[in-house]
Amino acid sequence: MTSKYLFAAFVAACLGTISCSSDAEQTTEQTTQRARVRLVCNTAPAVTMNAPSSRATLAANGKALTDIYIFDYNKATGALLQLLHQTSTATDFAEPELMLDYGEHTIRVVATRSTTPSLLDATGTVWTSADNVLTTISGTIPAALTATKTSDTFGASADVSVGVGTSQAVTITLDRLVAQLVIDSKDTYPAECSTFDIALAEYRSISCADLSVICSENNHRLTEVSSLAGKAGQAMTYFVLVPAEGYTTDVTITTNSTAGTQYASITVPNVPFARNKVTTISGTFYNHQQGFSVAINDTWDAEGNTINI
């Protein structure tokens, strides 16, 4: 699709300042000493880790995370040395063993259940490697992690020392990188309802180098709601990547009919988003009257926002 190529070009522009190749390798006759280190990924209290007899699983609020990306960086030079993309089918999911060179490392981890996650290089080209295989980096390097649709996502970094007498196991606690947006409809969905269109500025990628969220663009989330016809009090939930400091954006909600006409198009200005918090926009979206409400208040965190419209 054309939008796919436009998004790749957009990401390339976002990543223009990131080098697309690794530092030149130096030839040495010395044999590199290595050690096997077990990495255990867990998360904040809202996230649980289970260990069935078959394999480990990592879940958030009862929903399993599907992909884990582990980046092994040389702490001194910042060079990416190795990468492991684990899918939920891996027998050691969230608990892999890594072969690491002696020395100082920075390990960065992203765990997600976003739809179709993929790595991109600095030009916006998809960067591929074998799933569930620890891959040595050479040539072009991955610069960003993106997805076709953002869902619950976590990340963290940890410095690791590898050598004689150092720990053979490292635990990394992951923190949420997203906010949740809830559209809480207070009216009854009409018989001819078709789609909900949510338009907002959102971040589309995560930088591999420092796990910051990057590439903000205007995006549409289109949800098919025809199955809700005749029902009342139905809410829809979305996830958005959020910078550490949070951000605000206008959110436009458009309700459409099967005839191709609009019931309403409502813009809520300056909607706040913060990591690990839920923003709720509550009101009537088909027979709109005054009294919208926006809020951030959720079991994820003690604080939140609510906006009534």
PLM segments and residue spans:
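Bacterial Sec-dependent N-terminal signal peptides
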Residues: 2-5, 15-47, 183, 276, ...
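Structural motif
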Residues: 25, 40-62, 184-192
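Short, surface-exposed loop/turn motifs at beta-strand boundaries within globular domains
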Residues: 32, 63, 102, 174-178
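Intrinsic-disorder/low-complexity, polar/charged segments enriched in Ser/Thr/Lys/Arg/Asp/Glu/Gln
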Residues: 34-36, 93-95, 167-169, 180, ...
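Tryptophan-paired
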Residues: 57-124, 190-277, 296-298, 302-309
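Residues within well-ordered beta-strands of beta-sheet-rich folds
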Residues: 108-110, 180-184
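Extracellular beta-sheet/turn segments enriched in Thr/Pro/Gly and aliphatic residues
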Residues: 132-177, 184-186, 266-309
